[in-house]
């Protein structure tokens, strides 16, 4: 029994380590840099965020993987932006509680094929660095919309 518990503890410890590294090992600079650049990355995408008109349904899984641009640019005035896109299908299960039905179907999602660091839009820079408050003239919605 003790050997079993030790094996389980070791398994949990190993699963917590980043893939391809050994605990205590330092990832070399070029590998860190290669992983951080602006490029398409596997990202979890919420089905309801992509299809907000489908709130009457439950989806399983509730999110899918898709390649989306992400990573660092060399300057804060730049952002990682998609320069190429394609549509990909993902098979999901749609549950309709009001009808009491469920069915598999293919839903389309946008996937990024190419990414590039491009200048941020003027509104993007302002909204990230400075959030306005009611005293500055911004109208805020009342409760429950905070």
Swiss-Prot record:
GO terms for molecular function: chemoattractant activity; growth factor activity; toxin activity; vascular endothelial growth factor receptor binding. GO terms for biological process: induction of positive chemotaxis; positive regulation of angiogenesis; positive regulation of endothelial cell proliferation; positive regulation of mast cell chemotaxis; response to hypoxia; sprouting angiogenesis; vascular endothelial growth factor receptor signaling pathway; vascular endothelial growth factor signaling pathway. Its main location: secreted. Residues 133-146 have a biased composition (Basic and acidic residues). One of its GO terms (cellular component) is extracellular space. InterPro entries: Cystine-knot_cytokine (IPR029034), PD_growth_factor_CS (IPR023581), PDGF/VEGF_dom (IPR000072), PDGF/VEGF_growth_factor (IPR050507). Gene3D superfamilies: Cystine-knot cytokines. The keyword Membrane does not apply. Disulfide bonds join 38-80, 69-115, 73-117. Residues 118-146 are annotated as: Disordered. Keywords: Disulfide bond, Growth factor, Pyrrolidone carboxylic acid, Secreted, Signal, Toxin. Pfam families: PDGF (PF00341). Coiled coil: none annotated. Residues 1-24 form the signal peptide. The modification Pyrrolidone carboxylic acid is found at residue 25. It comes from the Eukaryota. The keyword Disulfide bond applies. CDD domains: PDGF. Homodimer; disulfide-linked. Interacts with VEGF receptor-1 (FLT1) with a high affinity, whereas it binds to VEGF receptor-2 (KDR) with a low affinity. Does not bind VEGF receptor-3 (FLT4). Belongs to the PDGF/VEGF growth factor family. Snake venom VEGF subfamily. This is Snake venom vascular endothelial growth factor toxin. The lineage of its organism: Eukaryota, Metazoa, Chordata, Craniata, Vertebrata.
